[in-house]
Amino acid sequence: MNRPYVFCHMMCALDGKIMGGYMGTPQGRAAGDAFYDIAFGKEPFYHHQGWLSGRVTTDDNFTFYRKPDLDEDAPVVPAGDFIAQPDFGMFYVSVDPHGKLGWESSTLRYVDTTAHVVEVLTEQVGNAYRAFLRKLGISYIIAGETELDHGLALSKLKEKIQHRDPDAGRWRRAELVVPASGDVR
């Protein structure tokens, strides 16, 4: 199977909700700190190359519902995937099948973690949005015609962002954390 090793690292309420008032309580904030430290802290439990969230979680925490600044007359971009910084080291993968996120930068910061943005799009996303991403240096992969093809997305992520481990001189296994927490501070 040509897919990255994916594991879910979630913070949720006892009723299964991933968003809610519980996150603002002292206990919720303490759990949020532990959530970050386990996955991203100075000595993380996971040694991953990126994490993945959906469009709404991305909008809630990073793009804040900004509209993309599209140029409908942008020159036609080449078909297919675009990987701007394959060796960045840490990646934030945003599943945005319809191309709606209003990014301002090709990187984002989550507490002490800086990551290169990789968008997962479908073929139906127009040239203007793809040109917008390229102009900002944001990577993207195409996974599906009109609906997201999850298997293809995972295969492409492993293929496109897997990189050599400079310490061991070997290929690192592409690993992604799939958080379901709305609290990314």
Regions found by a protein language model. Give the residues of each.
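N-terminal nucleotide/polyanion-binding subdomain common to many enzyme families
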Residues: M1-Y110
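Short, hydrophobic beta-strand segments that form beta-sheet elements in well-ordered domains
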Residues: W51-L52, V93-S94, V118-E123, D167-A168
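A glycine-rich beta-strand to alpha-helix segment
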Residues: Q124-R185
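Short, surface-exposed, polar/charged, turn-prone segments marking secondary-structure boundaries
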Residues: A34-G41, P78-F82, V120-Q124, T146-D149, ...
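Short beta-strand/loop segments at the ligand-binding rim of alpha/beta enzyme cores
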Residues: P26-R29, M90-F91, T113-H116, E159-D165
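Histidine (H) residue identity feature
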Residues: H9, H47-H48, H116, H150, ...
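Hydrophobic, well-structured mid-protein blocks that either form specific transmembrane helices
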Residues: P97-S139
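Short, well-ordered alpha-helix to beta-strand connector turns
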Residues: H47-Q49, G89, A115, G137, ...
